């Protein structure tokens, strides 16, 4: 009996070990599959600096004038300190920036969306922007009040992109069969994408005000569903080295992660030199970023940018 029990226990143990190995191997395959899946999405890269140098001086000046970005910032009353920081920092570099709030706020000028639902706020803001500014701006950039954006880098990234084509870009995320641009890093739509989205906003079957599921899905996923019906698909924005330029984390957190995973290349492993956005910032961090991006210079280092994007008329930006 003892030998039979012993054999039985050995069999159970061996079977358990075998099952554990199969599970581990399965996870390895699944994980690898996810990594492969991550690279199936569309990639959009910034232009090479060499290409910019080939452009004549007159063409560069025309480009700097013609690139116009309209910035949409979705805010709520609880975000008032972030709202103030965003208003005083990077939005001054947009050709025009407007704040869309969930309710009327006396402290700052904003466009009242009269709803607390983020998806409804986003829909209304996009419709307002397209109806009013479709003939004045080529690109529409939407962000949270926790996002810091370097608009000049955004313009540089978009330099060779045609706004009459349906672009929808930022930091892409895969969720089942749906690929979407995460709102944390900011969302960019060309005027053609805005046109297509606007044509669907009144068609509930294709772009419902509420998701067609029992549970609520996030506003950035809702947007992706609507745009998919319009033939507009999410594209991941990267620099020439394949690094993301729309970041869903702050610089501090990105550096902390780089110190863990790339201890010998912290700066190189952290972020792109041409980063467009960072997210998750406090009001103080907004001002620190503003100083670092637009004011701090190393003596003796000369920056020879081949193209300069002119600030909006009457702007008091840095």
From Swiss-Prot:
This is C1GALT1-specific chaperone 1. Defects in C1GALT1C1 in Ag104A cell line create a tumor-specific glycopeptidic neo-epitope. This epitope induces a high-affinity, highly specific, syngeneic monoclonal antibody. This is caused by the abolition of function of a glycosyltransferase, disrupting O-glycan Core 1 synthesis. The keyword Repressor does not apply. It is linked to Tn polyagglutination syndrome: A clonal disorder characterized by the polyagglutination of red blood cells by naturally occurring anti-Tn antibodies following exposure of the Tn antigen on the surface of erythrocytes. Only a subset of red cells express the antigen, which can also be expressed on platelets and leukocytes. This condition may occur in healthy individuals who manifest asymptomatic anemia, leukopenia, or thrombocytopenia. However, there is also an association between the Tn antigen and leukemia or myelodysplastic disorders. It is found in: Membrane. Residues 1-6 are cytoplasmic. GO terms for biological process: platelet activation; platelet morphogenesis; protein O-linked glycosylation. Changing residue 152 to K: In TNPS; loss capacity to promote Tn synthase activity. InterPro entries: C1GALT1/C1GALT1_chp1. Residues 27-318 are lumenal. Changing residue 89 to I: In AHUS8; likely pathogenic. The keyword rRNA processing does not apply. The chain crosses the membrane at residues 7-26. It comes from Homo sapiens. Keywords: Chaperone, Disease variant, Hemolytic uremic syndrome, Membrane, Signal-anchor, Transmembrane, Transmembrane helix. Probable chaperone required for the generation of 1 O-glycan Gal-beta1-3GalNAc-alpha1-Ser/Thr (T antigen), which is a precursor for many extended O-glycans in glycoproteins. Probably acts as a specific molecular chaperone assisting the folding/stability of core 1 beta-3-galactosyltransferase (C1GALT1). It is a single-pass type II membrane protein. Associates with core 1 beta-3-galactosyltransferase (C1GALT1), probably not with the soluble active form. Ubiquitously expressed. Abundantly expressed in salivary gland, stomach, small intestine, kidney, and testis and at intermediate levels in whole brain, cerebellum, spinal cord, thymus, spleen, trachea, lung, pancreas, ovary, and uterus. GO terms for cellular component: extracellular exosome; Golgi membrane. Belongs to the glycosyltransferase 31 family. Beta3-Gal-T subfamily.
